[in-house]
Amino acid sequence: MSDLNFEAMPNKLVNYATLDGIAVIEIASDANGAALTEVNDRSPNTYTHGMMSDLDDAIIRARFDDDVACIVLTGNGSSFFSAGASISMLNSVSPGFKYNFCLHANETLSRLEQTPKLVVCAINGHAVGGGLEIAMAADIRIARKNAGKVGLPEINLGVLAGTG
């Protein structure tokens, strides 16, 4: 994927590129949901409302591009595909915002799941919590050997998986 010229989406939390009929969407955020400016092998690629907005925009962009036949979704770096929602973001917002945030995440992942183009999730590291829910919205999931853990750890806290 080094031949790709990524373009940052508006909030700079998702990068987008196309090559030979494939749209590549890369999640790129730190533990607080802030944008990454370079490859960070330890970044958890957490998501916030801004990241979900960028992901939604990228999905729509790929869907309406007649030259794109397939979408590949991956994470920045090699430690995490995505660790799910930013805990610091969730701790700092109102219950009403959390409700609408989860609703928007549901709508975004439904759009990803229902897009008529083939969606492949390239799991390049841990895919946990909402990160796994993003991966589950793809048609095909493939992980590199020893990529990391896959799971929904929030169930140990009595919380249901809520965005996928």
Enumerate the language-model features and the residues they cover:
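Conserved CoA-thioester-binding segment of acyl-CoA-metabolizing enzymes
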Residues: 1-74, 110
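Structured loop/turn residues at beta-strand edges in well-structured enzyme cores
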Residues: 20, 66-68, 85, 114, ...
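Glycine- (often His-adjacent) and acidic-residue-rich active-site loop
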Residues: 29-42, 46, 75-108, 158
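An acidic, glycine-rich surface segment that forms the CoA-thioester-binding/catalytic face
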Residues: 49-64, 87-124
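Hydrophobic/aromatic residues within transmembrane alpha-helices
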Residues: 55, 73, 86, 134-135
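CoA-thioester-processing core
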Residues: 108, 112-114, 122, 128-164
